Amino acid sequence: VDTEVGLKDHKIHDIGALRDDGATFHQASQTAQNQFLQEGKVDYICGHNLIHHDAHYLHLNGILIDTLYLSPLLFPKRPYHHLVKDDKLMSEQMNNPVNDCEKAKELLMDEIAAWNLLSENKRKIFTLLLQHEEEFRGFLMYVGTIETDETTTDVSELILSEYKNHICAHADIPALAAQSPCGLAYALALIGTDDYQSVTPGWVLHNYPEVEHFIYVLC
């Protein structure tokens, strides 16, 4: 799902939606959009910056997946992902929400593939850190990795094992996880790359300024 919202009037000017059966929607009517999603028996709703932008304007009935927050976690290494620049989707067509839906779907498929390429330990670490964060929970539910019986102590042991030669063995990981699980996840994603020129995107540092400090503490 994608919306075009006026910068001055903050009103919805256009809505685009793409279902997994290939059907598309392109109108400015929320009522018609909801009917379109209901007809497709949609359980999960995906978008780029969906949770803190589109979802504020749309009355969405489903589990939300936001490709924006997943991208720096799963593509932390330069040149990052070709569909993303800063916090925006790269699109051939300006102000076309259906085209943006197609790009978000392509990005989601790549994010799922990248997730599946992570080691089992990394998937478990990110799940334990992020499963209660609204920006990540929908994706983790979709890929079926929600944990129910793990603790912060367990995730600390997993982190020390997975990043054994990359982080300080005496770092207070439980404290970092308690302070900002998202910040810790982004810091670990960057530490796990072998490209020291890779940097955390500016929008991540704006929303999670603790990431740089966490990297300093861990390394």
What are these regions (language model features)?
Residues H13, G22, S180-L184:
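Generic structural motif recognizing short loop/turn segments at the entrances and edges of beta-strands
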Residues L83-S156:
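Acidic, Mg2+-coordinating catalytic module of metal-dependent nucleases/exonucleases
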Residues D9, A17-W115:
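Conserved DEDDh/DEDDy metal-dependent 3′-5′ exonuclease domain
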Residues I12-I15, I45, I51, I63-I65, ...:
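Weak global preference for isoleucine
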Residues E134-C219:
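N-terminal helicase ATP-binding lobe
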Residues A32, H82, K124-I125, Y186, ...:
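Exposed alpha-helical structural elements
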Residues V1-D2, S71-L74, C219:
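Short intrinsically disordered, low-complexity coil segments enriched in acidic
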Residues V1-G16:
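Entry/capping segment at the start of metal-dependent catalytic domains
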